[in-house]
């Protein structure tokens, strides 16, 4: 295991285990240790190391797929994975998963190849209908531009309030207390969970529901309004002052 954004560690692991690494699997933007963006050159560096050592470059876009762009993080960061994992964002929150990739690898899956894959809920009609509706909405003009506008409004407003760390990528963001910046897992171990719990419950008392863990990403939706965004900012301002966090 290598730390996110630590390309030298990834390189060292490939050198330590020559010919033994089948693939590198990573989130292009982390969502469970805070929202952390890849530093310039990190994703490209991991991809190049994978291909140089005969390994697959696999991106877990369960959180970022259909959130950061129509083409997920790969569109946003101008990079292509060998294989991609997608989750319930593809189906508007209904239970669904999908994977895909380059033809040279996907042709190995049944019925064109020897790798058999099936499951009880594969092709579940309710989830598929949800996915059709989701994709029709997501591909309407201006959806992602609106998400960016709303997200920037919220994040900039929360940063102006102060007293907390706010990091974001597109419509994904998170709030934490303790460190000034988070770029990997080690940084996330410095979170002040006790203070976040107080902030979470104070916001909840005001009718604002955030992820219950400081490490988890929150996401802006296309159905959010400017008035709702402003309410979150105003509420956070009152709570920060009430808790004397700045």
Please describe what each predicted stretch is.
Residues 1-246:
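Conserved N-terminal phosphate-binding loop of PLP-dependent enzymes in the Aspartate aminotransferase
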């Amino acid at each position: 295991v290598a730390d996110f954004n630590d390309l030298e560690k990834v390189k060292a692991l490939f050198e330590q285990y020559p010919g033994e690494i089948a693939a590198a699997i990573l989130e292009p933007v982390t969502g469970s240790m805070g929202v952390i963006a890849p530093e310039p050159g990190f994703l490209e560096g991991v991809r190049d190391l994978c291909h140089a050592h005969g390994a697959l470059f696999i991106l877990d876009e369960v959180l970022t797929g259909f959130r950061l762009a129509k083409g997920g993080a790969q569109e946003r960061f101008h990079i292509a994975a060998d294989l991609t994992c997608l989750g319930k964002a593809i189906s508007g929150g209904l239970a669904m998963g999908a994977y895909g990739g380059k033809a040279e690898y996907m042709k190995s899956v049944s019925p064109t190849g020897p790798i058999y894959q099936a499951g009880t809920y594969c092709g579940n009609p309710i989830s598929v209908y949800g996915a059709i509706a989701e994709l029709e909405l997501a591909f309407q003009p201006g959806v992602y531009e609106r998400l960016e506008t709303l997200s920037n409004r919220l994040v900039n407003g929360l940063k102006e309030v102060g007293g907390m760390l706010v990091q974001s990528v597109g419509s994904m963001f998170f709030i934490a207390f303790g460190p000034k910046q988070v770029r990997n897992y080690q940084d996330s171990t410095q979170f002040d969970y006790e203070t976040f719990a107080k902030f979470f419950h104070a916001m909840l008392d005001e009718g604002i529901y955030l992820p219950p863990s400081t490490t988890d990403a929150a996401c802006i939706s296309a159905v959010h309004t400017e008035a709702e965004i402003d309410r979150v900012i105003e509420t956070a301002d009152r709570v920060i002052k009430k808790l004397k966090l700045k």
